[in-house]
Amino acid sequence: VHNADILTDFDLGEMIAAHAASGADATLLVARRESSRQLLFDASGRMRGWENRSSGEVRPAGLDAGGLDRKAFGGVHILGERACRALAARSRALGGAPFGVMPFYIDSCAELDIRGFEPAEAYRWFDIGTPEKLAAAEKSYMA
């Protein structure tokens, strides 16, 4: 799954191979970059929760975020069969109403093996969700 407002040139094949080798239920592109919202990972690379750095909110409630690694989500994710089944169950429970995938990951990280993936090589990454951000990305790619 690739969010439509993300432009990147990382090696997707490397991420697919890492996902297959790990046996994870889901693998998320992550990076050590500034973001008000950070995913929280343990030393093994498994997602344990989420933190809003602006408000101090941590989910799941009661999670001790100390010692966990903070990384920003990059908008690219690979889902295995268990994660797809869990997404379908969430959709059914909500009567087919739309829902955000990040709250799903946060709510499911205790049951599903959700892993972060950081590419080995340098890559470009842009949020192109506004005309201004798209213009900045275009300028970088044309340089």
Predicted regions and their residues:
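Structural beta-sheet core signal
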Residues: V1, A26-L29, G116
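Short beta-strand-to-loop acidic/aromatic patch adjacent to the donor-nucleotide binding site
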Residues: V1-L7
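Catalytic-core segments of class I nucleotidyltransferases/pyrophosphorylases
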Residues: L7, G13-A20, R33-E34, R46-A143
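A short, conserved acidic/glycine-rich loop-to-beta-strand motif
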Residues: S22-R32, R37
